């Protein structure tokens, strides 16, 4: 039994091609290397125990990114994918190296500088500011390494040419350009773009005119984004539109070595006919609101008058006070008008329901003379 167990263990080791002790060592090496093996080697096949055959070429180094996280993160995922793509042109800008004749010229220049050292050093050293970086081209080849600066840098006056790149925030004003909205309105917008240079070597080797490239890119991006939005959304959601435009621009400009910090829609210009139609529509909406408010006010006033009439009908003294208050207000507002008040009892008789059924009281006709209520007695003939 022991021999069978030993033979089976040997067969399993021979089939696997490696022992458990070696597997543990390899796992520890992968952990200590920080995932270096996953980047350099390709994916292992599921059914084989070997990483690959010796004759196959090894895959180039690449950055490992979780695809699910990139898709789920939205805007951050777009920026990550763009940054990964920006690594390719950066690798392509590396110099292939100088030739034999070029190295000979470099040695001659160095010897000449050494021979005239006290005076030549002033022509071989330049100063770079804190906000600047310098890219050096030697005989047309981009020198390897990072951009020079800030501080002093050395170059060969006869063979080298240098270019300074400003890393401060740049402002670019985008002129008015026409766009077509989702609801088929034609309008003009202008914007302001804030960007900065991040990779000086990549910028100089990729673009000839930075401002024109950024301007045209902003215009085409704004046309593409605003074509999926209505006129109302463009007027009300400028902040979200600017954020979407920033993400879309940054995903392209990072390949050029440019970082878009912010973009804002400055003004929206509508055609004259569209402005007139929108003004008429807004005026109609305002008039409708005014009518609704006036109707609500009349309704509230009539309700208040009805409640006041009910209260006054229950208290006769309140009616008399209201009558006197009305007479006083008339005398103060129009002092030239003479008001002859009627007796309040007569008003009660006129407004009583019995008088309404029987008819109004007979008033004397203006043609007949009115007899006084208490006629004076005539003097006797004796007096």
UniProtKB/Swiss-Prot annotation:
SUPFAM superfamilies, per database record: Band 7/SPFH domain
A GO CC annotation given for this chain: extracellular exosome
Illness association: Nephrotic syndrome 2: A form of nephrotic syndrome, a renal disease clinically characterized by severe proteinuria, resulting in complications such as hypoalbuminemia, hyperlipidemia and edema. Kidney biopsies show non-specific histologic changes such as focal segmental glomerulosclerosis and diffuse mesangial proliferation. The disorder is resistant to steroid treatment and progresses to end-stage renal failure in the first or second decades. Some patients show later onset of the disorder.
Cytoplasmic side: 1-102, 124-383
Effect caused by changing residue 254 to F: In NPHS2; uncertain significance
Annotated organism of origin: Homo sapiens (Human)
Lipid modification (S-palmitoyl cysteine), residues: 101
Matching SMART domains: PHB
Region (Disordered): 1-76, 355-383
Composition bias, Basic and acidic residues: 1-41, 374-383
Gene3D superfamilies cross-referenced by the UniProt entry: 6.10.250.2090, Band 7 domain
Function: Plays a role in the regulation of glomerular permeability, acting probably as a linker between the plasma membrane and the cytoskeleton.
Subunit composition and interactions: Interacts with nephrin/NPHS1 and KIRREL1. Interacts directly with CD2AP. Interacts with DDN.
Keyword vocabulary terms for this entry: Cell membrane, Disease variant, Endoplasmic reticulum, Glycoprotein, Lipoprotein, Membrane, Palmitate
Pfam family, one: Band_7
Superkingdom of the organism of origin: Eukaryota
Segments forming a coiled coil: none
Family note: Belongs to the band 7/mec-2 family.
Gene Ontology biological process: actin cytoskeleton organization; gene expression; glomerular filtration; metanephric podocyte development
Name this protein carries in UniProt: Podocin
Intramembrane feature spans: 103-123
Tissue: Almost exclusively expressed in the podocytes of fetal and mature kidney glomeruli.
């Amino acid at each position: 039994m022991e021999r069978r167990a030993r033979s089976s263990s040997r067969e399993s080791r021979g089939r696997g091609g490696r022992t458990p002790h070696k597997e543990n060592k390899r796992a520890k090496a992968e952990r200590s290397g920080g995932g270096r093996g996953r980047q350099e080697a390709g994916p292992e096949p599921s059914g084989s125990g070997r990483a690959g055959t010796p004759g196959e070429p090894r895959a180039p180094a690449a950055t490992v990114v979780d695809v699910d996280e990139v898709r789920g993160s939205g805007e951050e995922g777009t920026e990550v994918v763009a940054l990964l793509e920006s690594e390719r042109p950066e690798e392509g800008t590396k110099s292939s190296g100088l030739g034999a004749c070029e190295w000979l010229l470099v040695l001659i220049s160095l010897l000449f500088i050494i021979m005239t050292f006290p005076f030549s050093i002033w022509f071989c050293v330049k100063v770079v500011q804190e906000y600047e970086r310098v890219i050096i081209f030697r005989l047309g080849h981009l020198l390897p390494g990072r951009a020079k600066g800030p501080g002093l840098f050395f170059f060969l006056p006869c063979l080298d040419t240098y270019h300074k790149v400003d890393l401060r925030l740049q402002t670019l004003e985008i002129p008015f350009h026409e766009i077509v909205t989702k609801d088929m309105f034609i309008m003009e917008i202008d914007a302001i773009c804030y960007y900065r240079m991040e990779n000086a070597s990549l910028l100089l080797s990729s673009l000839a005119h930075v401002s024109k490239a950024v301007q045209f890119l902003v215009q085409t991006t704004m046309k593409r984004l605003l074509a999926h939005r209505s006129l109302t959304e463009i007027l009300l959601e400028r902040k979200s539109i600017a954020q979407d435009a920033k993400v879309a621009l940054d995903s392209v400009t990072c390949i050029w070595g440019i970082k878009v910090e912010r973009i804002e829609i400055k003004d929206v210009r509508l055609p004259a006919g569209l402005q007139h139609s929108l003004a008429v529509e807004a005026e109609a909406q305002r008039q409708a609101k005014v009518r609704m408010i006036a109707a609500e006010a009349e309704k509230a006033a009539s309700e208040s008058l009805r409640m006041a009439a009910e209260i006054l009908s229950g208290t006769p003294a309140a009616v008399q006070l209201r009558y006197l208050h009305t007479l006083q207000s008339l005398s103060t507002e129009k002092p030239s008008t003479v008001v002859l008040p009627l007796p309040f009892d007569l008003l009660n008789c006129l407004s009583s329901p019995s008088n309404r059924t029987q008819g109004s009281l007979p008033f004397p006709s203006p043609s007949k003379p009115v007899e006084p209520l208490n006629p004076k007695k005539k003097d006797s003939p004796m007096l």
